[in-house]
Regions:
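DNA major-groove recognition helix of helix-turn-helix/homeodomain DNA-binding modules
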Residues: 54-69
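Alpha-helical residues within the helix-turn-helix
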Residues: 21, 32, 61
């Protein structure tokens, strides 16, 4: 099984989406703060593109969330 289809990875992406939506941040706004096109956000959220740890850190920083807290909450379930 490729890691993009791993249930843990899918949960991680669901949590990223949840945080973004709870903060009322659109894909366009997040992409702008990351200096990426909106399609980058859409591809990650639709599981068409894998996100690496540096990108995850930048993504969470843009959402004002700590990577350590985020990972702890994703994997404690």
């Amino acid at each position: 099984m490729s890691s993009i289809h791993d249930p843990r990875y899918k949960n991680l992406i669901k949590e990223l989406i949840k945080i973004r939506e709870l903060k009322n941040i659109t894909q366009v706004e997040l992409a702008t703060s990351l200096k990426k096109p909106q399609s980058y956000i859409a591809k990650v959220e639709n599981l068409d593109r894998r996100i690496d740890v540096i990108e995850l850190h930048d993504w969470l920083s843009a959402l004002d969330k700590s990577i350590s807290d985020f990972l702890a909450s994703c994997f404690e379930k």
